[in-house]
Regions:
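Conserved functional acidic sites
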Residues: 1-159
Length: 159
């Protein structure tokens, strides 16, 4: 079963909206459209991040329980944000063409958009071939996604 602590690794709740600045300074408003705890296995995860109704697997195929939250924005160029938490704070972040799996172990305080945040997980990856930035993101269990950049697209949380 998914513990309350593991489920709370995603701070977003039903009906909540979250505002971000995009790469050109426009404000994007994301709305929580899905919040579901379900028996988890790989197929259910793929269905959940793609917005498909999660069908409950046979008991022998259930690996554990997970919570998936999806936020969308009506702007034409905005990426869908999907967060999944599994036991032991194993955490996934999916945004259209990007799927990241991490353990939510905070690695330091950071200042983002002029605000100091404690217990922030920061993940950054560069291409081994070109040295180009592939993605950069900051996440906090209390506030959620703080900053995300992939290619020309970026989001910065507005408090």
């Amino acid at each position: 079963k998914l513990s309350e602590e593991d489920a709370a690794a995603i701070p977003y709740r039903e009906g909540q909206t979250v505002k971000f600045l995009n790469q050109v300074g426009d404000t994007l408003t994301y709305q929580l459209v899905r919040d579901e705890i379900y028996p988890y296995n790989g197929d259910q995860y793929i269905n959940a991040i793609n917005g498909v109704d999660v069908m409950h697997p046979a008991p022998h195929s259930t690996e554990c329980y997970a919570r998936t939250v999806i936020l969308i924005c009506e702007e034409w160029d905005a990426k869908r944000l999907c967060f999944t938490a599994r036991p032991e704070k194993e955490f996934s972040f999916h945004s259209d063409d990007l799927d990241l799996n991490i353990c939510l172990l905070p690695n330091g305080p950071y200042t983002i958009n002029g605000i100091d945040y404690e217990h922030v997980h920061h993940e950054i990856l560069y291409s081994h071939y070109t040295g180009e930035l592939l993605y950069d993101w900051y996440y906090n269990e209390e506030f959620g996604l703080l900053y995300f950049k992939k290619g020309d697209f970026s989001l910065t949380r507005i408090p």
